[in-house]
Amino acid sequence: MLPAHKQTLEALLADSVKQVAHALKGADAAFVAPAITLERPKVAAHGDVACNVAMQLAKPLGTNPRQLAEQIVAALTAQPAAQGLVEAAEIAGPGFINLRLSAAAKQAVIAAVFEQGRAFGTSDREKGKQVLLEFVSANPTGPLHVGHGRQAALGDVLANVIASQGYAVHREFYYNDAGVQIGNLAISTQARARGLKPGDAGWPEAAYNGEYIADIARDYLNGETVAASDGEPVKGTGDVEDLDAIRKFAVTYLRREQDMDLQAFGVKFDQYYLESSLYSEGRVEKTVDALVKAGMTYEQDGALWLRTTDEGDDKDRVMRKSDGTYTYFVPDVAYHVTKWERGFTKVINIQGSDHHGTIARVRAGLQGLHIGIPKGYPDYVLHKMVTVMRDGQEVKISKRAGSYVTVRDLIEWSGGAAAGQEAAPDLIDEATITRGRDAVRFFLISRKADTEFVFDIDLALKQNDENPVYYVQYAHARICSVLNELKSRYNVDVAQLPGADLSQLTSAQAASLMQKLAEYPDMLTHAANELAPHAVAFYLRDLAGEFHSFYNAERVLVDDEAPRNARAALLAATRQVLENGLAVLGVSAPAKM
């Protein structure tokens, strides 16, 4: 039901409960009513709304739950405000209260969608608050892999979901550009620049084997200039002995490549934060010094340890090794201090499940600083692995990366790119990229983050209802076609439909579709509160299913004006909600397919 109706019904039920409690216990008796919880029954025949408050209160009030439910229903239906909202009420099982909404209450969603348009489903309840989402945060040592793709989809969609509730959302990418892996990138590029390739004598053991390294070396030797979206241009010097110059060029080259991958995926960031800046600005040392002064550390075996067990970790952790280098979670603590200092009191990190062990360490470090950061800061969404299948076989390598499937591979394959074009993005037309982007974004968000996901390229290419993104997009396109035909055959424009007589919508299929439309705002709120962006994909599939059921049951383009326009109005509202939901996912809503 619509949020306004839900709030009204919750208030009416709460008042009814209060009346019954006073009648049973006396007006002066101490009584704390539980929060009213409304749910949609799993079986449509049981009504539109179910409430279990009678079973919660039966024992405290010393009465039978079914009798209590009957008294609550009597008090509810006696209230004038309920009579235009509730059509019928019945008691089920041990004391469930099942309510049927009035036809007018169900139909109200159509007017709400027409009135609010693209804003339908959104809320300003969190207006004035801000949240930082950090996601992808890949090392600039190679192309983005499918795990980064899942992070990008989760992060970007979750950002849209949270923004729908009024938050100002800041998207941030943390570049791990300081560490051993960057050194390995430099020596890999240097080896390629010297004419070596994997398997040759002299090829570094820790080197990266992907063909992209050869591309970097070639451009470095040719004196090409590269630049990331937020950085200064770097020119290749061609000097194979200057490892620092090679490192700078290779990092910038790969940052540019990752920018291109993200652009193809429809993901934009507000800020890129460099790990190296934490060292150059002295933030890592400052954080370590503060933890030492706070008594949160001790020295043992030549290493500096953090008392993470004080904050619930299973053992204390090394911060600074005996060789003077820091372990990887130390700059993470310093980085999160910057988030707090920048005013982000709500922070969400989206990372692979292999980062689970760092959560307690980072939080312990932040608590040990005693600077007002609350426990549980930051929040985390951890995702599991993605397996790619093509032609019934698991795909483990690609020409582009050498040892893993890249995001760009996935987009191009899912868009139908011909074999052999994977390493030549300039050969891929925009329509292929759009199809691929839509499929990959929808697929990667269509499961809970904490479940492993099998990405089936063959399924992504299917143009039938087995393919979830096609199924949802086709529903939108089908409605567009019907509304175009409405205009050409009957000269009725969508702008005229808000005046339709909605009392014509009497079928069970119409009622079910209207109820599903009305659930959209609450679904978005739930997805934001629970950090569950997959809920949007689940909802859209269900909505498309309700549309198809309605459309298959009732002819829309009939000569009788009243039922025709009412049904067309329902379709127009459905089209708008499909478009709104697809926009949250960053997926296109085609008018033709």
UniProtKB/Swiss-Prot annotation:
Arranged from A to Z, the UniProt key words for this protein are: Aminoacyl-tRNA synthetase, ATP-binding, Cytoplasm, Ligase, Nucleotide-binding, Protein biosynthesis
The protein's matches in InterPro entries, at most eight in alphabetical order, are given as: aa-tRNA-synth_I_CS, Arg-tRNA-ligase, Arg-tRNA-synth_N, Arg-tRNA-synth_N_sf, ArgRS_core, DALR_anticod-bd, Rossmann-like_a/b/a_fold, tRNAsynth_Ia_anticodon-bd
Q: What is this protein called?
A: Arginine--tRNA ligase
Q: Could you tell me where this protein is found in the cell? A: Cytoplasm
Q: Which HAMAP family match?
A: Arg_tRNA_synth
**How does the record describe its quaternary structure?**
Monomer.
**Entry annotated with the keyword Protein biosynthesis:** yes
Q: Which GO terms describe its cellular component?
A: cytoplasm
Give the superkingdom in one word. Bacteria
Q: Which GO terms describe its biological process?
A: arginyl-tRNA aminoacylation
Q: Which family does it belong to?
A: Belongs to the class-I aminoacyl-tRNA synthetase family.
**Reactions that this protein is recorded to catalyse:** tRNA(Arg) + L-arginine + ATP = L-arginyl-tRNA(Arg) + AMP + diphosphate
Which PANTHER family does this UniProt record tie to the protein? ARGININE--TRNA LIGASE, CYTOPLASMIC (PTHR11956:SF5), ARGINYL-TRNA SYNTHETASE (PTHR11956)
Q: Mind telling me which Pfam families this protein's record contains?
A: Arg_tRNA_synt_N (PF03485), DALR_1 (PF05746), tRNA-synt_1d (PF00750)
**Gene3D superfamilies attached to this UniProt entry:** Arginyl tRNA synthetase N-terminal domain (3.30.1360.70), HUPs (3.40.50.620), Isoleucyl-tRNA Synthetase, Domain 1 (1.10.730.10)
PROSITE patterns from the UniProt entry: AA_TRNA_LIGASE_I
Q: Which CDD domains match?
A: ArgRS_core (cd00671)
GO MF annotation terms: arginine-tRNA ligase activity; ATP binding
Q: Which gene encodes it?
A: argS
Q: Might you give the EC number(s) for this enzyme?
A: 6.1.1.19
